[in-house]
């Protein structure tokens, strides 16, 4: 099969999964709040931080989606690994869709460097998948290690700096909107860590050169997070 046909097939699978998995993801997502404290009760600093969270997480999940898309294309011939990557990819599609909606609902501008994230993420996924299965899994291990720590950091800030907000009745209470966001991040963090464990179980540490590959990818991911929060 030609490379062009493979890309078309990969795109069709991505679109199909994007429709099917969103429905299946509803059952494990925390319910969206119907009332309670909202953005109007946040200070300018809190509002700015919340926008950074949504912007960087949307960019990160976009990147994860396309990393797995690249790996899926490169390893589509591997019958053992293909369903494993597909499962993780489907979860990332749902993560991306969720943050796309949050970005739209709260009118948060996307990262200006979104085209770069798209090209870089797909290229990274395809390149490591083209190397071999172990390199692809080492890539997953490195990315999910950074993202797991990133989500934990966000949860600490949201728990410590967004408590006791004033609601519409001028009373102090926990923001249901913030609690919903925290619940969403917790679910996604746990799934990212599942991907990390899956990568280790599928021989990520047998990649060569393991240390150079994983540390390089971690550095790239950390830099991307830093930039996407701000630009």
List the model feature ranges, each with a label:
Residues 2-231:
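Non-heme di-metal
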């Amino acid at each position: 099969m030609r490379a062009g046909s493979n890309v078309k097939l990969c795109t069709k699978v991505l679109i199909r999964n994007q429709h099917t998995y969103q429905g299946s993801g509803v059952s494990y997502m925390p319910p969206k709040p119907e009332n309670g404290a909202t953005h109007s009760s946040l200070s300018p600093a809190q509002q700015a931080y919340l926008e950074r969270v949504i912007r960087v997480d949307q960019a990160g999940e976009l990147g994860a989606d396309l990393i797995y898309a690249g790996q899926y294309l490169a390893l589509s011939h591997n019958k053992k690994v293909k369903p494993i990557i597909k499962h993780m990819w489907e979860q990332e599609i749902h993560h991306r869709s969720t943050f796309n909606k949050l970005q739209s609902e709260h009118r948060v501008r996307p990262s200006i460097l979104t085209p770069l994230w798209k090209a870089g993420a797909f290229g990274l996924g395809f390149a490591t998948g083209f190397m071999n299965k172990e390199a692809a899994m080492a890539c997953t291990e490195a990315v999910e290690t950074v993202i797991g720590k990133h989500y934990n950091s966000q949860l600490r800030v949201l728990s410590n700096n967004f408590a006791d907000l004033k609601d519409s009745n001028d009373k102090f209470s926990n923001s249901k909107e913030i609690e919903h966001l925290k619940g969403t991040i917790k679910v996604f963090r746990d799934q990212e860590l599942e991907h990390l464990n899956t990568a280790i179980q599928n021989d990520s540490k047998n990649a060569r050169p393991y240390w150079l590959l994983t540390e390089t990818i971690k550095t790239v991911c950390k830099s991307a997070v830093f930039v996407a929060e701000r630009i």
